[in-house]
Amino acid sequence: MTHLKDLPLHTLQFYATAPYPCSYLPDRQARSQVATPSHLIHNDAYSDLVLSGFRRSGMFTYRPYCDGCRACIPLRVLVNSFQPSRSQRRAVKQHQNLLARVLKLCFVPEHYKLYLRYQTGRHAGGGMDHDSIDQYTQFLLQSRVNSRLVEFREALPDGTAGALKMVSILDVLNDGISAVYTFYEPDSSAGYGTYSVMWQIEQARKLGLPHVYLGYWIEGSAKMNYKARFAPHELLIDGRWQAPSDFTR
């Protein structure tokens, strides 16, 4: 069982937010449980928090704490037994010409412009398509844990890096990689999002890490339901990571 009382987190405090409109399910109210203070949430503490279903947005570490709703279920891919589907293998083949460069978190104007194009093309009207540089920085480039920025560029004929196509933010935890956020050229047919997850699974394998944490799976949300296509995976139900076949609503 993975409960907060069992973890070495006695120095942290937890509070519940007031209700706010749910970002994923229409006509629902959401609440979050927030871990504070942020300066004490180092990589070991955050790794433990992720085991209990927490995520981070910048310096904000939270998990769903909604009244009467359990739709947001943490999901992690089992790296060593992962079996890609035909469409996932196709995404890897389609983007085998991308060159990945792993960086520390840093602001690059070209990344920010791609972020705005992505928000406008894929999530127009969602409130993030007009994010300022400060908002972008607070959301993606602030972290007290072991975070990385990965940029993916198209390879030119001479093997050098060309046009920017995608950026992924990830955290390297004690037992896996946590996918924070990915944005890319908003071409709906390109399969960049699938390729990003496949790349992170392969990176976890190279690092000897058994899991890739994809955040919350929400069965009724088209934006989140795709995560269940990466199999085998486990869901965090009632404090225990378990196979989907063991879970009955």
Curated annotation (Swiss-Prot):
GO terms for molecular function: arginyl-tRNA--protein transferase activity; leucyl-tRNA--protein transferase activity. InterPro entries: Acyl_CoA_acyltransferase, Asp_Glu_LeuTrfase, N-end_Aminoacyl_Trfase, N-end_Aminoacyl_Trfase_C, N-end_Aminoacyl_Trfase_N. Pfam families: ATE_C (PF04377), ATE_N (PF04376). Its main location: cytoplasm. SUPFAM superfamilies: Acyl-CoA N-acyltransferases (Nat). Belongs to the R-transferase family. Bpt subfamily. Functions in the N-end rule pathway of protein degradation where it conjugates Leu from its aminoacyl-tRNA to the N-termini of proteins containing an N-terminal aspartate or glutamate. This is Aspartate/glutamate leucyltransferase. The lineage of its organism: Bacteria, Pseudomonadati, Pseudomonadota, Betaproteobacteria, Burkholderiales.
